[in-house]
A protein has these predicted regions:
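Mature extracytoplasmic enzyme cores
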Residues: 1-174
Length: 174
């Protein structure tokens, strides 16, 4: 991507590393996920889904519900902010590996009886790894949560309506 660097007068080239450019096995993952009959099989299928990182939700006929933030997410040295380009020739900015699969955020059968996700922040400051610098604002998640908490029994039509819901919680703040 160095042709986009402009003429800075410095002998520096740019490069990019992204997990989605590595060979992966998403097709096998999707096949396994589609064939899964329980959470364990579903999660096993996710082991082959590396990029791009995704939020996955699961529900089975036995009532199991689950969520997993999944993908190969690089680990950087403490304090490294990978939002902007880094001087990749410096060893401190090399990837130190990936967040272990069994340590990726997940929720299985939460006490509240439902799962809501809308690209919102899914971990707090106690989570030992950096997942992202960019999260969706919480309003859409909060609206989904609000609707689910207020209703004990939702129909398919209720869920369709929630998909088209135009309530703007941010507007309520004003």
């Amino acid at each position: 991507i160095s042709e986009f660097a402009g003429d800075s007068g410095v002998d520096t080239v740019l490069s990019r590393r992204w997990t989605a450019l590595d060979p992966t096995a998403e097709l096998q993952a999707i096949l396994a996920i589609n064939r899964a009959t329980n959470w364990e099989e579903f999660e096993k299928g996710l082991e082959d889904f590396h990029a791009p990182a995704q939020n996955f939700v699961f529900a089975s006929l036995d009532g199991t519900i689950a969520y997993k933030a999944n993908g190969k997410i690089p680990i950087y040295e403490d304090g490294t902010d990978a939002l902007l380009p880094l001087p990749g020739w410096e060893k401190q900015y090399e990837w130190k590996g990936f967040i272990p699969f069994d340590e990726l955020p997940k929720v299985i059968n939460p006490e509240k009886g439902f799962i809501a996700t809308a690209n919102n922040r899914v971990v707090d400051e106690s989570y030992p790894y950096h997942i992202s610098n960019v999260w969706a604002q919480p309003y859409r998640y909060e609206r989904i949560y609000e609707v689910l908490v207020e209703n004990d029994s939702l129909t398919l039509d209720d869920m369709k309506a929630l998909q088209m819901d135009a309530v703007n919680l941010r507007a309520r703040e004003f």
